[in-house]
């Protein structure tokens, strides 16, 4: 079986080798663990954001960045593009931000391949039927502070590996790399909703592609949390190839999948978050989805499209000024 941690390590080694070119720093902790600073005390770069995103996806996706008008009328933004032939493993088995790393006063949302070793959360791996037995652990952290030896020891223990085989990549939300990697979750937002909300077997998704605008740096981590979410919810476009069986209603799946099917749709994420008393659990889970969904039912040959790009909400979210 494919090892997302071993695949990711190949990319990590390239980042370490080219650290000066891609504006990152590499720190060797006293216990032997390796930290890659991709935006805390360094600027990062487009290339670092691209590679960070690819690592999040367990090395099982193509990641590209371009400047494209796409469907966002009146808004010009860079876009991240994702293509994968292993959608369930890459997005849910690796990329999903399913590990809240809390050690002492340190907190970060963890995503990427190491989750497959620690089985965070276990149910996800049971549902997609995937496990990794690598002797290295690669974890991506969304945080504004770098982890210490204690954090690395915790990750090593949870993953069942030696601490010197732990690699921790860190990027704040309010950084170029952080913004890129969050928009790079556009395909994962769809597979997440399929599995967690609509209870659809994501192993039937054979190929997937998507693109989403990359949020400008408009403020601190809290402000960027809103902007980065909006890029996917109101600007993300996805395409899924599904091998259905006779019991699947793919038309209904497509109709229910985009963010506009949610009762909380229509306002910038920060407004929705505020109305929910800043409690994620009060927000409709169905809102966390791409703006546009296209599904090719490979069994019937039919193609369905649902959702829309909402340029007005994107402009409002970013405080867009047209001169």
UniProtKB/Swiss-Prot annotation:
A molecular function (GO) term: methenyltetrahydromethanopterin cyclohydrolase activity
Locations listed in the record: Cytoplasm
Single GO biological process annotation from the record: methanogenesis, from carbon dioxide
Keywords carried by this UniProt record: Cytoplasm, Hydrolase, Methanogenesis, One-carbon metabolism
EC numbers on record: 3.5.4.27
Major place of residence: cytoplasm
Function: Catalyzes the reversible interconversion of 5-formyl-H(4)MPT to methenyl-H(4)MPT(+).
UniProt xrefs under HAMAP family: McH
Name used for this protein in its record: Methenyltetrahydromethanopterin cyclohydrolase
Organism: Methanocaldococcus jannaschii (strain ATCC 43067 / DSM 2661 / JAL-1 / JCM 10045 / NBRC 100440)
Organism ancestry: Archaea, Methanobacteriati, Methanobacteriota, Methanomada group, Methanococci
